[in-house]
């Protein structure tokens, strides 16, 4: 869930000004906004309501929340910088009939509809990486496990038709071979299955970084960075 709201360009200018000052007065904020007095009052009031700005006497300054928000600004462009998504990728291993199997998921939502790969999940605000791994496993599979950190994978996805990056993700690779419980076969947005790597070689629709991610998560000590290309139909 996002904890941020879209703000007006004038409000962004006000936050940028306050980012470089301990505090300042109304006249200074009006000057940087380029607006008439009534309009500036409206925008400052809105920033106070959002909890980004505090007023003390005749002075204005950033609140703790405002400092954190304004620090994300690209100060040249005056917009919030777009940043990579940060998530966990779970390598869950078990032995069954003498073979190593891995808990994998078929994605049943866009993007990558129908693709197979390891479970993933975004890290929530204030949540540790280990907490995320345990929560995501429980929510999507019904299983419980303790995880080991095995490495990091920075994956950027480029659209083959336009050449533009459509995704930028940082995955923390988490490994376990001690999962317990009864696995859910389906969840909101996909289905789960235990599969061997040999079975996955015959699977036509799997993420393009699948083997690199799995090997890195199994072996450990990984630092991966790569660009994957997907067409409009694949994405």
For the regions a protein language model found, what residue spans apply to each?
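N-terminal strand-loop-strand
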Residues: 12, 76-117, 145, 175-178
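Conserved Nudix-box catalytic region and its N-terminal flanking loop in Nudix hydrolases
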Residues: 35, 99-139, 143
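Acidic, metal-coordinating catalytic segment for phosphate/diphosphate chemistry
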Residues: 59-89, 164
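Unchanged
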Residues: 123-147, 154-210
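Short alpha-helical segments that sit at the start of domains
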Residues: 1-14, 74-75, 80
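Short amphipathic alpha-helical interaction segments
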Residues: 33-49
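Nudix hydrolase/Nudix homology domain
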Residues: 5, 9, 17-37, 113, ...
């Amino acid at each position: 869930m996002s904890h941020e709201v879209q703000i007006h360009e004038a409000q962004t200018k006000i936050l940028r000004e306050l980012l470089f000052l301990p505090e300042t007065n109304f006249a200074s904020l009006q000057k940087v906004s380029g607006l008439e007095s009534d309009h500036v009052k409206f925008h400052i009031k809105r920033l106070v309501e959002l909890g980004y700005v505090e007023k003390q006497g005749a002075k204005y300054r950033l609140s703790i929340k405002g400092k954190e928000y304004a620090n994300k600004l690209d100060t040249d462009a005056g917009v919030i910088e777009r940043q990579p998504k940060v998530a966990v990728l779970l390598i869950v291993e078990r032995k069954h009939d003498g073979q190593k199997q891995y808990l994998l998921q078929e994605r049943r939502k866009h993007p990558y509809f129908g693709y197979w790969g390891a479970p993933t999940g975004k890290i929530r605000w204030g949540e540790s990486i280990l907490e995320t791994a345990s929560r995501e496993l429980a929510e999507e599979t019904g299983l419980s496990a303790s995880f080991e950190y095995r490495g990091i994978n920075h994956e950027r996805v480029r659209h083959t038709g336009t050449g533009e990056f459509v995704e930028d993700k940082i995955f923390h690779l988490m490994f376990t071979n001690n999962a317990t419980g009864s696995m859910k076969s389906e969840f909101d947005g996909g289905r789960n299955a235990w599969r061997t790597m040999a079975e996955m070689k015959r699977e036509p629709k799997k993420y393009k970084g699948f083997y690199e991610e799995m090997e890195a998560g199994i072996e450990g000590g990984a630092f991966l960075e790569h660009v994957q290309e997907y067409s409009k139909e694949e994405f």
